[in-house]
């Protein structure tokens, strides 16, 4: 019996080893760059990293990323000067672009059409409006040299707070245990395709059983509407607070948004108070092709082409070219 257990353990180990090799050879497990908090308390990726972002159990999306010396996914370094024309794209994972090869990003698409300018992409998954303005404020000397800054914003989740503070949730992913676990591509792959979901759910249920909580009372439609209206009011106040605190430059800054999913009161406020914004809703609605990936709502290559085109039209309108 003892020999059987030992042999089984050895076979199991070798099976795991073979699977680990297969996952690595075929790049089934994604590479996740390390993140950190810099001296300005700006959360970003550690500079000078390369790897591949993989999504789906059949490698539905496979793209290469390159973290530059500034800590962002881009094919170029950020070196603004008074002698060049630069545009900054600031935002979350949609700007970060891990779903597309870094050398075929939105910024690169814009530069291909307008060789006169350099586009700097300050994209980081999870950035909200507070993160973005804190970044711009922290690197003021750099951003003051950039001719135009475009900030991506989604009303429903980018304005949930009215001031910047460090969000430890993402940084906790850099704990020693998580770093150790990420060294196994097999484990990373299993987690990405949901193999580890059942045991995690079992642990959650056991904890819930041991610590019974009161059930939340059902919310009727009127109450849900009231909560929604309160949140929308709060988000608008948060926006006002942030643009005031960080001295938002209306002449040089432009918001990038989708009016289809943006609160009408917020849009009215932007127009009334002369906040410039780029609305890509029309181009997306008119598109006969899908603008998003199959497995999530991030823009696909066609969607990114439309975003780049919309930004180019805006830059042409404001006559950024000298």
Where are these regions (language model features)?
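Conserved, well-ordered alpha-helix/loop/beta-strand core segments that scaffold catalytic motifs
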Residues: 148-159, 211-285
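Membrane/wall-proximal cationic-aromatic binding patches
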Residues: 28-114, 286-287
């Amino acid at each position: 019996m003892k020999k059987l257990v030992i042999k089984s353990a050895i076979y199991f180990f070798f099976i795991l080893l073979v699977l680990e090799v297969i996952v690595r050879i075929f790049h089934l497990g994604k590479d996740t760059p390390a993140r950190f908090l810099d001296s300005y308390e700006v959360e970003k990726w550690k500079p000078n990293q390369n790897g591949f972002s993989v999504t789906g159990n059949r490698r539905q999306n496979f793209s290469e990323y390159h973290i530059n010396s500034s800590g962002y996914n881009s094919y170029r370094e950020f070196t603004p000067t008074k002698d060049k024309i630069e545009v900054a794209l600031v935002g979350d994972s949609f700007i970060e672009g891990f779903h597309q090869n870094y050398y075929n990003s939105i910024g690169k698409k814009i530069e291909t059409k307008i060789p006169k300018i350099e586009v700097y992409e300050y994209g980081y998954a999870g950035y909200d409006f507070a993160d973005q303005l804190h970044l711009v404020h922290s690197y003021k000397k750099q951003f003051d040299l950039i001719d135009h800054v475009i900030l991506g914003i989604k009303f429903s989740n980018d304005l949930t707070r009215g001031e910047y503070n460090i969000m430890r949730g993402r940084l906790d992913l850099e704990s020693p245990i998580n770093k150790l676990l990420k060294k196994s591509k097999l484990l990373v792959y299993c987690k990405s395709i949901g193999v580890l979901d059942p045991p995690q759910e079992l642990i959650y249920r056991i904890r819930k059983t041991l610590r019974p909580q009161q059930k939340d009372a059902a919310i009727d439609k009127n109450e849900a509407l009231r909560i929604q209206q309160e949140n929308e009011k709060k988000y608008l106040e948060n926006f006002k607070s942030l643009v005031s605190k960080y001295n938002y430059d209306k002449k040089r800054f432009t918001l990038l948004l989708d009016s289809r999913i943006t609160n009408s009161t917020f849009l009215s406020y932007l127009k009334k108070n002369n906040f410039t914004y780029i609305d890509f809703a029309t181009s997306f609605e008119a598109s006969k092709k899908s603008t998003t990936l199959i497995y999530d709502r991030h823009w696909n290559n066609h969607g990114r082409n439309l975003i780049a085109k919309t930004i180019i039209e805006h830059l042409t309108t404001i006559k950024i070219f000298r």
